Amino acid sequence: YTKGKNATEMAMLIDAMDILYGERMDGFCLVSSDSDFTPLAQRIRQEGLTVYGFGERKTPTAFVRACDRFIYTEVLRKDDKTAGTVTPKRKVYSTRELKQDTRLVNLIRNAVEDSADDNGWASLGVVGQNVTNRSADFDPRNYGYKKLGELVRAIQLFEIDERSMDNSPAHNIYIRNKKRRTSNSD
């Protein structure tokens, strides 16, 4: 065997193709920040399988977009609380910073519009799926928030309605764009 990065990548590619054609899988997980895996992700998706990508923020956009879902590994790291270890805190974006992120705001607004009922309300769960379908690397943790609901609240550009579920302590969250006020009472 030849040693080195390219030899390792080639061996991984051969293994992936063997698995793709030899066994029935529901999806693949590719952990890399290397754009060399972009064609592999595209080929796997052509076969109708889901591709989950994991990599660092430096991952090239082409590879991120080739995946159905892409998660930056930085958001997966837990704060290390062991003695003598200092782990930098993840940045939590302020309301002002979030509102200025036009890509983020438009992504969520468009997802709300596409998922909304006649009064403009959309289930947060459906909005989340819609956002993920539009942007493979979307994750509220990229902005310092654990959940989409926390991020939406922090942006402060959406009305939020928590609706009780029958015979359950749980509730469903619905949101709508604040800009979209109708003259009808909702």
Q: What does each of the following model-derived ranges do?
A:
Residues 1-186:
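Terminal and domain-boundary accessory regions
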